[in-house]
Regions:
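Nucleotide/phosphate-binding sheet-loop regions of phosphoryl- and nucleotidyl-transfer enzymes
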Residues: 1-171
Length: 171
């Protein structure tokens, strides 16, 4: 059934959308697609690129934002999925599309420098850990040092200046 081909989270989001609940715009690269890509990545890469481009264009049109834009950047989440709920076991990348070139645009949209720099810091860490399989310890240590330097007891207490330094350090 559909849950096996799209994963538990995507399936439930689709069900919510079908009954009229507000859910974010999305698309799914289903299990058959991913299995085919996994069989021969080099041969299938052009089809993947074309599919991603068309789906990103659809999201841009629906949201009025543009992926990679310095003025109104579209940010996306990339989530792995499984047919059953597996809390904490599946990888997620949030705020994909946030780069040095899109930071100012997100700041203009949100007016919140702390949000922007914390999101960037988290994306850098997630990308390093999930995509490049870097250990989490250096990121945790850098966060602990930033908190100690500013007297923060929790990461939420770091101001955007500290988060900016932390994000730049982690790049």
């Amino acid at each position: 059934g559909p849950v096996e081909t799209m994963g538990f989270k995507a399936f439930n989001l689709a069900r919510m959308a079908a009954i009229g609940l507000p859910v974010p715009q999305a698309f799914v690269l289903g299990t058959p697609f991913c299995q085919t890509f996994g069989d021969d990545p080099a041969a299938f890469r052009p089809a993947l690129r074309k599919l991603l481009e068309s789906q990103i264009e659809r999201l841009e049109a629906a949201c009025g934002l543009e992926f990679g834009s310095g003025r109104k950047p579209l940010l996306v989440s990339v989530r792995s999925g499984a047919p059953v709920s597996m809390p904490g076991m599946m990888d997620t990348l949030l705020d994909v599309g946030l780069t040095d070139a899109t930071l100012r645009g997100l700041l203009r949209l949100t007016g919140n420098p702390r949000l922007v720099w914390d999101s960037y810091r988290r994306l850098i860490q997630q990308y390093a850990e999930v995509v490049h399989h870097n250990p989490a310890a250096p990121f945790r240590e850098a966060l602990a040092l930033a908190m100690a330097a500013t007297g923060a007891r929790r990461p939420q207490e770091l101001d955007f200046h500290a988060l900016t330094r932390l994000a730049r350090r982690n790049l």
